UniProtKB/Swiss-Prot annotation:
Autoubiquitinates upon viral infection. In turn, autoubiquitinated TRIM26 recruits NEMO and bridges TBK1-NEMO interaction. This is Tripartite motif-containing protein 26. Residues 295-545 form the B30.2/SPRY domain. Disulfide bonds: none annotated. SMART domains: BBOX (SM00336), PRY (SM00589), RING (SM00184), SPRY (SM00449). It is found in: Cytoplasm; Nucleus. Residues 376-440 are annotated as: Disordered. Belongs to the TRIM/RBCC family. The lineage of its organism: Eukaryota, Metazoa, Chordata, Craniata, Vertebrata. The gene is TRIM26. Interacts with TBK1; this interaction bridges together TBK1 and NEMO in order to activate TBK1. Interacts with INCA1. It comes from Sus scrofa (Pig). Keywords: Coiled coil, Cytoplasm, Immunity, Innate immunity, Metal-binding, Nucleus, Transferase, Ubl conjugation, Zinc, Zinc-finger.
Amino acid sequence: MATSAPLRSLEEEVTCSICLDYLRDPVTIDCGHVFCRSCTTDIHPVSGGRPVCPLCKKPFTKENIRPVWQLASLVENIERLKVDTGRQPGEVAREQQDTRLCERHQEKLHYYCEDDGKLLCVMCRESREHRPHMAVLVEKAAQPHREKILNHLSTLRRDRDKIQGFQAKGEADILAELKKLQDQRQRILAAFEQGHQFLWEREQHLLDQLAKLEQEVTEGREKYKTRGDGELARLAQVISELEGKAQQPAAELMQDTRDFLTRYPRKKFWIGKPIARVVKKRTGEFSDKLLSLQRGLREFQGKLLRDLEYKTVSVTLDPQSASGYLQLSEDWKCVTYSGLYQSSYLHPQQFECEPGVLGSKGFTWGKVYWEVEVEREGWSEDEEEGDEEEEGEEEEEEEEAGYGAGFGYGDGYDDWGTDEDEESLGDEEEEEEEEEEEVLESCMVGVARDSVKRKGDLSLRPEDGVWALRLSSSGIWANTRPEAELFPAQRPRRVGIALDYEGGTVTFTNAESQELIYTFKATFTRRLLPFLWLRWPGTRLLLRP
């Protein structure tokens, strides 16, 4: 059975540092260290002088050796208190100090040689090899290292506490963020549930009204059929009688001809309207409601997809890239065409001949969205609606007259002639038309690579690093080769530009009606910038928001 820890500690205190056994007849020397009396007799003087303490190296006089009776009594008591009687005295000390015994002398290592960096026992310390060296007690030599370790431990404990604090705070932040996400999940579900409920109610309301109309039409159909069948039966009877009368002999026929024809006078037969005018009117109103529903859902879907999928960004124009033909507002969000080259200094990044300008902020990833408003003098909503109404009336008149639908929208597209006329055009006339198209008053909105050419005449097409729409009073074109003419339902006053860099698309929409106008597809490898081009007096391009 093992000895208790306090008893073992006492055993170490009453162990002689020389013989490593219990102190037998313990005595103290001048320096205060205690050894067995017999062990002190083995300590010889140094170089003819006085002997020195094996532990602290202080000289002492053997005549001053004094017994320590209290310690001797303590040794006896410890021996009596030993639990493990089978263990010999000093065995505990040896068990605990085996790893600290001198390999040569099997003595306890009390000293540390600072010259050789080795632990020494008393015998090694007195040997010829280490006697000239600086040797100190192991406890004293270990103290600086212990202090360094303790300081390092203190630093590590502070770091541990900081990490634990950061970890606790991080865990709290994570839990808070998860709570936010859970709350947002519930809000999303509630929002969609509310939307589903609203749409379901509107759907049921419209379907109920439509069912009532269907019932009215069905009831009218029964009445119409019943009355028509009655009229047909009456006419069938009259026809049958008249057919029989017509087959009678002449004498019999002429007996009551006057009375017979009087009985069957010719009446105006019934022609009823199968559908009441009020029902037709309400059906037409339903058609208008359906168009409004489709338009509203299209606008809602477009805006929702844009807001959820794309990040709306605020962009500004780069004045260093602006052509001398253009004038920028102070906030760099509006550009106008001056018609005169007003720049006295040509910046390296400036468009030289083309009236173009780039945005100040570029994009190399993500999905972003911004808008460009085309503000044209004389473009009022009333005028546009009037033009569309007049155009619709003209188209109806043309259709009634046997003509095909026109090409117009807004101001209308001109029909330049028949296919035969187009085929008869020479190469020179085609080149003249291309030149006329190039100088056509118009504007372009889109995106461009940051490396797009700025000098000389440019085509500003996708192969040149520009993906843009061209707008004019005559129509809209995708600036491709060849140009693709577009026919949106409405002329856009505000063009939405949605850039999906990773997806490789640039999508243009009518920002007001959410109508899709055109989508470019490409693989982007460089930074893309907003791009505006304006050669249209009286027109301003404004970046939104």
